[in-house]
Amino acid sequence: MGTALLQRGGCFLLCLSLLLLGCWAELGSGLEFPGAEGQWTRFPKWNACCESEMSFQLKTRSARGLVLYFDDEGFCDFLELILTRGGRLQLSFSIFCAEPATLLADTPVNDGAWHSVRIRRQFRNTTLFIDQVEAKWVEVKSKRRDMTVFSGLFVGGLPPELRAAALKLTLASVREREPFKGWIRDVRVNSSQVLPVDSGEVKLDDEPPNSGGGSPCEAGEEGEGGVCLNGGVCSVVDDQAVCDCSRTGFRGKDCSQEDNNVEGLAHLMMGDQGKSKGKEEYIATFKGSEYFCYDLSQNPIQSSSDEITLSFKTLQRNGLMLHTGKSADYVNLALKNGAVSLVINLGSGAFEALVEPVNGKFNDNAWHDVKVTRNLRQHSGIGHAMVTISVDGILTTTGYTQEDYTMLGSDDFFYVGGSPSTADLPGSPVSNNFMGCLKEVVYKNNDVRLELSRLAKQGDPKMKIHGVVAFKCENVATLDPITFETPESFISLPKWNAKKTGSISFDFRTTEPNGLILFSHGKPRHQKDAKHPQMIKVDFFAIEMLDGHLYLLLDMGSGTIKIKALLKKVNDGEWYHVDFQRDGRSGTISVNTLRTPYTAPGESEILDLDDELYLGGLPENKAGLVFPTEVWTALLNYGYVGCIRDLFIDGQSKDIRQMAEVQSTAGVKPSCSKETAKPCLSNPCKNNGMCRDGWNRYVCDCSGTGYLGRSCEREATVLSYDGSMFMKIQLPVVMHTEAEDVSLRFRSQRAYGILMATTSRDSADTLRLELDAGRVKLTVNLDCIRINCNSSKGPETLFAGYNLNDNEWHTVRVVRRGKSLKLTVDDQQAMTGQMAGDHTRLEFHNIETGIITERRYLSSVPSNFIGHLQSLTFNGMAYIDLCKNGDIDYCELNARFGFRNIIADPVTFKTKSSYVALATLQAYTSMHLFFQFKTTSLDGLILYNSGDGNDFIVVELVKGYLHYVFDLGNGANLIKGSSNKPLNDNQWHNVMISRDTSNLHTVKIDTKITTQITAGARNLDLKSDLYIGGVAKETYKSLPKLVHAKEGFQGCLASVDLNGRLPDLISDALFCNGQIERGCEGPSTTCQEDSCSNQGVCLQQWDGFSCDCSMTSFSGPLCNDPGTTYIFSKGGGQITYKWPPNDRPSTRADRLAIGFSTVQKEAVLVRVDSSSGLGDYLELHIHQGKIGVKFNVGTDDIAIEESNAIINDGKYHVVRFTRSGGNATLQVDSWPVIERYPAGRQLTIFNSQATIIIGGKEQGQPFQGQLSGLYYNGLKVLNMAAENDANIAIVGNVRLVGEVPSSMTTESTATAMQSEMSTSIMETTTTLATSTARRGKPPTKEPISQTTDDILVASAECPSDDEDIDPCEPSSGGLANPTRAGGREPYPGSAEVIRESSSTTGMVVGIVAAAALCILILLYAMYKYRNRDEGSYHVDESRNYISNSAQSNGAVVKEKQPSSAKSSNKNKKNKDKEYYV
């Protein structure tokens, strides 16, 4: 807990403990606490964790005071015992930050008598016993029951540095406690006596006076102030009062006699004011390279008691003030981190003392007086010497040297202010000389008095002065601290010539965990083993921080030594003093007061550094530098961020602030301050970057964001891979590392594929990340065999994550530190591992992604990657962006920049009889399949593999939906893939099918996932060939029952992944059948906006497209031929269509379209009526020159009219009307669509439609003009009239215009009729070239949903409109009308028909007629296909390609053909999709 005020060697502690134990045991001595500020005693740590007790005896007359305290150094747990409330003991403690528990004793103990106190700890309970007559216990309410103890056991008070550092005390209020005044003895822990480790302002007393509270220093004649007069300082030595008169100008036992001869130190305090009684002061200024050297060889010192006095004034924190002696017989007095350090060794170990002020430091540029005394004493028959050091006469520390050697003998030199090599002086805690002023340096013993300052000024022949010393006090320039603000900032220092010996010291302060502080290396030399390639070796020296710990690294050619300088972390924002000293192969590294020795391996003692010494980091251009593998921060690009001050090299100060200015170093600031505000509080990291507080800066972890930059503000480049693409970083030189930081983001739909790997041209060394069965697999192989390691285990592997082939972004992080591995995926728990063997060096020439090209040493090659990579960072280098920006010239790649849709190795199965056979699918225990497909076919077998017994696997399309069928031995199972619509839409779809070892089956189509767990058998035992695209024709009959396929797959397959294997469907095929080609040409002609004229609907098919012209009034392959046209002349005429009585439809939705030209203001064009007595009707009419529709389906008359278009202008117009229940739409030409949504609940069924009347003669408003291309719910009545249909009757003045087109001569009619006669649901993606703007409403973003008639058979229970309120469920499924945005029904898009019952004979006739129609349709379609204009569109997809998302449906190249005048004015933005049933 904190920095101890006394530091001793282990031997000395043991001897001192034995000494004190003897004193305590034989004489019953105790510790006297005078109640002074700064008093304290520290005993060894009492492990009061669980069950333990300690006891002591106490004697006092004080009513208040801190008796005892210990804690966990600033976290949660503590225990405090104080005197309070009239001299009663109060105990408080806490565990795990719980509310402190407190008990107050009933018995006062401040009566001047001895009292026994015992404290018993039992987990959450603590009991206080007093004099065996009182016992009280208390329990703390904490979640944890064990108490944590880190500090020593403090008795009587706390050390000053702990009071000044509140963060190191768990109980902050303990700083304000009054010190204890009285005596304490017989301290025991678990019945065993314990001795104090160190103390301050506390005296050892054999037996306190019975009066209590007194001491020899308080005795004296009545009326006198005490034993020591004239300001003398009293201390108790061997139970006697001893007066220190050195600062008074008096002498004698009680400082009563004026001293006219002997110089004390008191007058020095007045020296600056000239009040020294006229005596000359001997002062000298030292600037770091000067020192005095007094030769003792002629008159060696031999003394048992001696005294050293001096005064100093400085701004420097560290520096040697005085030293004499060598080997194991010396005295060293120095300033260490602003405190006064004394080290004495008389042969049996060092006595060390460190005196610190209560507040601040001694390097405050004020005068301070130091006095060191040593006296030989015989105590209880044991010889020892008591050493006392005091600063300014107040801060005093007392201790003992060992009993074996009590004489200080020195025939060496007295060094003052420094030495030739301070770091090499025995026991020296610092390595640099003093910088400041020293005054009146005096050594005296019983025989000699050496006034060293006077001798130097007077030029005594035994005194040598090194350097130019000014014998007055001058200001010495301070070594200002500097701050390295960024990891890239650094300072270059001159070459360090430290071949045999050397020292470096500095102070640093930071909160950052990593950073290279110092680094230099020597000339490269080649070491060649007979078996292995040449290796470059260098001598080097480095000091670095890793994970908050400070490390020394040194190699003198015989092997590297790596020392952790301190067990605790040093990135807590406090100043730390580092002192490195070496002499040949051995030396020390010390941090503050803790010193760690080292011995370098091998025989070499020469450190040959040829390069500059870098401070704070390394230059960006590292071409000339050689980085040893052991210096991890250099290879990880961790520059130091924090403060540095007081840099001394070989005892010489370095003005690093001035060096930074001369070098114009960016990111170096000439000061050091710690900002109180935490930078991360302002959320500076954008795009969800993780923020960490650094040293006066924020550090953003952008690895999981897809962004780069200091604040994650710059979007990272994406690379797209299609299985044949790669990026390879070919490093300029071979790299050797022992630590790596790797991070990347990936997105893939495949369960297998290489993400990143380091590769070597000379070895099997690799660090590899890959996808393996949907998990991330890390492989590290250090090829120990090649370099002749002692032990080798082979590659280490770690796995992390599950189901990572979900086409989502995932982040992978790898951290290796020597043998330690850590793998993290996203924010999941990190997977850790420890590598076996002695070898830790990774060798690599390349960093590869997508494909491993360096395969010489690979036993198996990982699967190529298909997907996307982003933010690949290796040891701080963002290689993808560096390649893209041209910042490095050693990257090779053919992967595509940017996020692109990936279609890998596409293959076209041009016919349904085409297929390939591959080797058996290996899916015994688990399986991961992936492929992409594009088709316009509803059905087709995609994949089939049979096996032993009934085992098999099938993937097929059924009515546009994907089926996964399998049998593991327990019977066939079917899983239907989930999709919002049929998949035969001529778009690419992604399919992933997997089975894990627990029989969890997963089918993912694009983003929709279906899962199912099956019981029983877990293995899929496949034996025969794997068929892709179909099977032989005769095989379809023998496929398992749950398989629907009767023909093969027609379309494109791509990115086929069979359990990690990427087959070439053509090259790897055992045999092929039918027409199979590379690439994906798709349909030779594809639907475009203007494929069909006059708002015809384009129907995409694999071998082309057809146009549905039913709602256009036009005909022909492209809807640009006139429809069947009749002229109704003056006097009127009428065309009537009558449904057979047993075949009258009832519909929920109707579609009507017709073209016309007229000049009439009033007329009826078309009227549809229901059977007699029902009253349902629909009428298209002209009223006042405007077109309108009226209809009634059982509730009220509903009207809709286009009021803005005048249509009796003699020009040709097309009107389109749709109804869905009571809702309706009306459109004239390309005018906006009019919508009608009547209020209230409406009946929906147009019942039992009987007649269609064209011409309006019966209604008394005969039409006069031209009518063309009438379409109503699948009936082309004018075409049927021209063909003399038996159900058509023509009366009046009606004449057919032009040729008589057949109702089955166009592809549009064929499509419509086939749809009407079909009983299966058929959905096809279509493109409608029409304006969809709605009057009074913004245009909808949804496609117009358009279907052919949905034919439903009505039962006898639903004959009338009574069923409209709650209509019957149809016996065969139908497609529901989609609702538009806002929840309202759309304008009608489908004709829904309910037909009355018909006889069996009628059904047979209908089937025969349908078959005949199909044959005619096929013949005509083939004729038109052979003669149609082939110049529309052509698609040529390469074997491997990545398309832009805007062209993901085939990336076709469009060749426009001439359009009619009407189609040329179409709004090309009006593009929708329609679905046909």
Swiss-Prot record:
Residues 213-256, 676-713, 1083-1120 form the EGF-like domain. Glycans are attached at N125, N190, N790, N1223, S1355. The chain crosses the membrane at residues 1402-1422. Brain. GO terms for biological process: adult behavior; axon guidance; chemical synaptic transmission; gephyrin clustering involved in postsynaptic density assembly; learning; neuroligin clustering involved in postsynaptic membrane assembly; neuromuscular process controlling balance; neuron cell-cell adhesion. It comes from the Eukaryota. It holds the Pfam family Laminin_G_2. GO terms for molecular function: acetylcholine receptor binding; calcium channel regulator activity; calcium ion binding; cell adhesion molecule binding; neuroligin family protein binding; signaling receptor activity. Residues 31-217, 283-473, 480-672, 718-891, 905-1080, 1126-1294 form the Laminin G-like domain. Residues 31-1401 are extracellular. Residues 1423-1477 are cytoplasmic. Ca(2+) 2 binds at D765, L782, R841. Keywords: Calcium, Cell adhesion, Cell membrane, Cell projection, Disulfide bond, EGF-like domain, Glycoprotein, Heparan sulfate, Intellectual disability, Membrane, Metal-binding, Proteoglycan, Repeat, Schizophrenia, Signal, Synapse, Transmembrane, Transmembrane helix. One of its GO terms (cellular component) is plasma membrane. Residues 1-30 form the signal peptide. The keyword Transmembrane applies. InterPro entries: ConA-like_dom_sf, EGF-like_dom, EGF-type_Asp/Asn_hydroxyl_site, Laminin_G, Neurexin-like, Neurexin-related_CASP, Syndecan/Neurexin_dom. Ca(2+) 1 binds at D329, L346, M407. Disulfide bonds join C228-C243, C245-C255, C437-C473, C643-C672, C680-C691, C685-C700, C702-C712, C883-C891, C1052-C1080, C1087-C1098, C1092-C1107, C1109-C1119. Residues 198-221, 1325-1390, 1444-1477 are annotated as: Disordered. PANTHER family: PIKACHURIN-LIKE PROTEIN, SP2353, ISOFORM A. This is Neurexin-1. It comes from Homo sapiens.
